[in-house]
């Protein structure tokens, strides 16, 4: 908590540079979409009484250009150094599918609770297929010392999903779902 406000770290997945740029598909780049969504979540959370730190502060920001591993460790370090109350990493899925899924760190009951409320609210706002809540050992979930989740918004390489990801209205729907889920997790009403 910072000044009595929960501190949330939003992690727009991947980097702008050649190291760890993420998936591409349907004319979209994951690093652009994740930043666009996270930058829309931030003011919604701030309006609802949260302090928000972003791991990337602009579209062309790079968390680390050394390696994918260094980038993942640095993202967790940002959250740990900020003494965050919650960490959410935002991603786009790829590989031919459809829908939204949210991950939590293996055997973390509070992570599962967070992932469940994020998933439910995002699916409700966006209306894509509910692929469920799943456990995983992703580095950003493993190395963060607070409740954490990783959201795979939709499939960037599937036309219907990409249409949602690439549109302003779709990005705003993701942002509302994420912000509503975080508010619900902390027992706050979304305003």
What name fits each language-model region?
Residues 49, 99, 129-130, 145-147:
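A generic structural signal for alpha->beta connector loops
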Residues 39-50, 80-84, 92, 119-128, ...:
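Sec-exported extracytoplasmic/periplasmic mature domains
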Residues 109-134:
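Active-site-adjacent substrate-binding region
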Residues 106, 122, 155-157:
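Non-catalytic surface loops within mature trypsin-like serine protease
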Residues 30, 119, 152:
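Acidic-residue sensor for enzyme active/binding pockets
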Residues 6, 77, 81-82, 87-89, ...:
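Active-site-adjacent mobile loop/cap segments within catalytic or ligand-binding domains
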Residues 74, 120, 163:
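Charged/polar, solvent-exposed surface patches and flexible loops
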């Amino acid at each position: 908590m910072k000044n009595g406000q929960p501190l949330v770290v939003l992690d727009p997945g991947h980097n702008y540079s050649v190291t760890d740029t993420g998936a591409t598909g349907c004319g979209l780049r994951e690093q652009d979409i994740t930043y666009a969504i996270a930058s829309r979540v931030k003011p919604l959370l701030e309006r609802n009484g949260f302090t928000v730190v972003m791991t990337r502060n602009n579209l062309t920001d790079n968390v680390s250009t050394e390696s994918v591993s260094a980038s993942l460790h640095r993202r967790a370090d940002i959250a740990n150094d900020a003494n965050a109350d919650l960490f959410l990493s935002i991603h786009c899925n790829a590989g031919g599918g459809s829908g939204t899924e949210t991950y939590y760190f293996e055997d973390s009951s509070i992570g599962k609770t967070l992932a469940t409320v994020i998933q439910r609210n995002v699916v409700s706002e966006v209306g894509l297929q509910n692929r469920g809540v799943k456990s995983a050992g992703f580095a950003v979930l493993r190395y963060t010392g607070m409740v954490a989740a990783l959201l795979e918004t939709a499939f960037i390489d599937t036309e219907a999903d990409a249409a949602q990801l690439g549109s302003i209205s779709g990005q705003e729907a993701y942002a509302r779902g994420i912000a509503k889920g975080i508010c619900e997790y902390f027992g706050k009403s979304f305003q």
